[in-house]
Amino acid sequence: MALKQYKPTSPARRGMTVSDFAEITKSKPEKKLTKPVRKSGGRNAHGHITTRHIGGGHKRRYRVIDWRRDKDGVPAKVAAIEYDPNRTARIALLNYADGEKRYILAPVGVNVGDTLVSGETVDIRPGNALPIKAIPLGTVIHNVEAQPGSGGKMIRSAGSFGQLMAKEGLYAQIRMPSGEVRKVLQDCKATIGQLSNVENSTVRLGKAGKSRYLGRRPTVRGLAMNPVDHPHGGGEGKSGQGNPHPVSPWGQKTKGQKTRNNRRTDKFIVSRRKPGPRNTPQ
């Protein structure tokens, strides 16, 4: 993948970049592997907003992805690399030897015509899926299961990868894209390689309208709201936030304050990710 740049014919075009989609080989999805998806607008069944800044966007059909990679020992040929509007990575259409078709996340280095397979004794090459116990230390992986047979849950976004760091007893240690080191059962499956669309994080949208195409609504500052809407709201003219510490709309500290509260899975985190400049506690 490469990024395409435009001439500055307008303020929006100046600095705008888009993917050149050179790796895409098929424009229309496999109809039997798609299903409709309804927009929620960020609302739950009661109509209350549970996730802000969601709404609108282009209509999409959901591509059914094979997260489990459970057809062990059955070779599959890569028939196409496709765009998926529901995720940042590209997807690959696999034609299995028994006639079945499935979508998987496309890793870097997987091309049309390649043969992929899953199982405990398969080769260590991009796109093949194996139990972690069969993967050598230091291997780059993605689409990692949290529980055996549950399907890939971690490391699924464009350009991301984890690295197998150690094996000890029933568990293996994996370094996540965030830098966190996490323990996972060795019977869990993972796919070899780094995910495609590596330069996705460097794409510049250029204008607000592109965010709206993607279904992202504007993020309004709390300071610009009324007191009824946000703790920072109100005041005459450009007044300050009036708090000793910036807070979220619900009163939680918002500058790097830890909000994770899941003691059940704390034991699986070997080392936390290092805080970046934007999430350093203040």
Curated annotation (Swiss-Prot):
Residues 24-55, 209-282 are annotated as: Disordered. Residues 24-33 have a biased composition (Basic and acidic residues). The keyword RNA-binding applies. Gene3D superfamilies: 2.30.30.30, Nucleic acid-binding proteins (2.40.50.140), Ribosomal protein L2, domain 3 (4.10.950.10). The keyword Magnesium does not apply. InterPro entries: NA-bd_OB-fold, Rib_uL2_dom2, Ribosomal_uL2, Ribosomal_uL2_bac/org-type, Ribosomal_uL2_C, Ribosomal_uL2_dom3, Ribosomal_uL2_RNA-bd_dom, Translation_prot_SH3-like_sf. GO terms for biological process: cytoplasmic translation. One of its GO terms (molecular function) is structural constituent of ribosome. SMART domains: Ribosomal_L2, Ribosomal_L2_C. Residues 34-55, 209-219 have a biased composition (Basic residues). GO terms for cellular component: large ribosomal subunit. Keywords: Ribonucleoprotein, Ribosomal protein, RNA-binding, rRNA-binding. One of the primary rRNA binding proteins. Required for association of the 30S and 50S subunits to form the 70S ribosome, for tRNA binding and peptide bond formation. It has been suggested to have peptidyltransferase activity; this is somewhat controversial. Makes several contacts with the 16S rRNA in the 70S ribosome. Part of the 50S ribosomal subunit. Forms a bridge to the 30S subunit in the 70S ribosome. Belongs to the universal ribosomal protein uL2 family. This is Large ribosomal subunit protein uL2. It comes from Anaeromyxobacter sp. (strain Fw109-5). The lineage of its organism: Bacteria, Pseudomonadati, Myxococcota, Myxococcia, Myxococcales. The gene is rplB.
